């Protein structure tokens, strides 16, 4: 068992419980034990199929494999789980679920978050028949516990957007970290292309809190964020950051920029659609006063990075005054965030670096 998988199991069951004998649940490890991403319960096919909703790969091959495995599960054969392990019952977690929901025989699936010092464990909580009751987030590291706490605070300030954002069922200290139990959002995975439903949701979001900021203030704020990580980067990265800030300053220093509440990680995999309405979850990166448009920038860049396409195929930043400067600041801020949270995320970091260099070269 890898160290990451062991840590997730310990967090789930409790370190002491995980090492004791007693009832154990079998989980399939996807895509493999060497590269664990999701743990799906094996047994009752209804709970297994519901757990597969938790596993949402976007790569074509992984989606095909998921579809094939779901068809096998429907036959009732459990031999499909080639990579599996047995995990002790999470007694503390079961007691919490019973207290909050009344369900005394919950079934669980687990999702390991992105690698890095903010890595979290997300646990899908279901009834034995497969109905999802909610999701538990647990910080695996101390910094990730702070992020879970941040998400709880954000959700408690977004009650006006319910039921299109999760509701906090429970939040509090747990196993020297922090735990958030939130309600599920319903629907199918959201589309990978920006549409009217995305804009409608973002307009409702920004209506919660809106303020105007001098453009130069935004440049200084992003500069401070960048400097927190730039000192440990190669001098070429430092030069790229300095050039980006100088270019953005020239674009924005005489402008006033509307800002408001932003999701911070607005992307297809954090959305669901039902009856033509968008629901959004995973709010740990929420910001009170981000420039309007940063969520749409992020959505487009994340999709373009995943599909290895140019972000320029999605929208034109020359469409309005200051848009290019704001895009430069978004890229630098996003690059700083990725370097801080996932320094080994080569593709995401490299995509943003190349996008910055390309945009700066276009204006030189």
Language model features with spans:
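Conserved short submotifs of the Hanks-type protein kinase catalytic core
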Residues: 177-187
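ATP/Mg2+ or Mg2+-diphosphate-binding catalytic cores
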Residues: 311-312, 337-364
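Conserved catalytic-loop position in the HRD/HxD motif
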Residues: 265, 270, 282
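Conserved kinase catalytic-core helix
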Residues: 151-166, 185-226, 242-267
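Juxta-kinase regulatory segment immediately upstream of eukaryotic protein kinase catalytic domains
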Residues: 2-111
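Active-site Asp-x-Gly
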Residues: 274-316
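Short beta-strand micro-motifs within the conserved protein kinase catalytic domain, predominantly
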Residues: 167-177
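ATP-binding glycine-rich loop module of kinase domains
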Residues: 119-149
């Amino acid at each position: 068992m890898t160290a990451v998988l062991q840590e997730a199991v310990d967090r789930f069951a409790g370190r002491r419980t995980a090492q004791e004998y007693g009832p154990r649940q079998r989980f399939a490890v996807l895509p493999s034990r060497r590269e664990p991403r999701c743990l799906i319960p094996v047994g009752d096919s209804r709970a297994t199929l519901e757990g597969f909703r938790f596993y949402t790969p976007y790569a074509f091959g992984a989606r095909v494999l998921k579809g094939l495995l779901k068809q096998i599960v429907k036959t009732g054969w459990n031999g499909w789980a080639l990579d599996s392990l047995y995990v002790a019952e999470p007694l503390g977690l079961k007691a919490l679920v019973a207290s909050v929901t009344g369900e005394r025989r919950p079934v669980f699936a687990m999702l390991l978050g992105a690698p890095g010092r903010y890595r979290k464990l997300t646990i899908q909580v279901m009834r034995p028949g497969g109905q999802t009751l909610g999701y538990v987030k647990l910080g695996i590291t101390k910094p990730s516990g702070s992020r879970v706490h941040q998400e709880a605070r954000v959700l408690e300030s977004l009650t006006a957007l319910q039921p299109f954002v999760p509701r906090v069922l429970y939040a509090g200290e747990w196993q020297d970290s922090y735990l958030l139990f939130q309600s599920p959002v319903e629907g199918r995975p959201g589309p990978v292309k920006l549409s009217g439903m995305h804009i409608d949701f973002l307009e409702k979001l920004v209506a919660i809190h809106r303020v105007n900021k001098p453009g130069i203030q935004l440049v200084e704020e992003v500069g401070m964020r960048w400097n927190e990580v730039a000192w440990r980067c190669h001098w070429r990265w430092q030069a790229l950051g300095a050039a980006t800030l100088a270019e953005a300053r020239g674009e924005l220093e005489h402008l006033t920029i509307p800002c408001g509440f932003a999701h911070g990680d607005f992307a297809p995999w954090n959305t669901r659609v039902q009856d033509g309405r968008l629901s959004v979850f995973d709010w740990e990166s929420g910001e009170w006063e981000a420039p309007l448009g940063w969520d749409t920038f992020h959505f487009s860049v994340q999709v373009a990075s995943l599909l290895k396409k140019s972000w320029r195929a999605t929208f034109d930043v020359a469409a309005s005054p200051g848009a290019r400067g704001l895009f430069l600041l978004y890229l630098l801020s996003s690059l700083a965030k990725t370097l801080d949270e996932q320094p080994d995320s080569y593709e995401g970091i490299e995509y943003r670096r190349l996008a910055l260099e390309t945009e700066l070269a276009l204006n030189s």
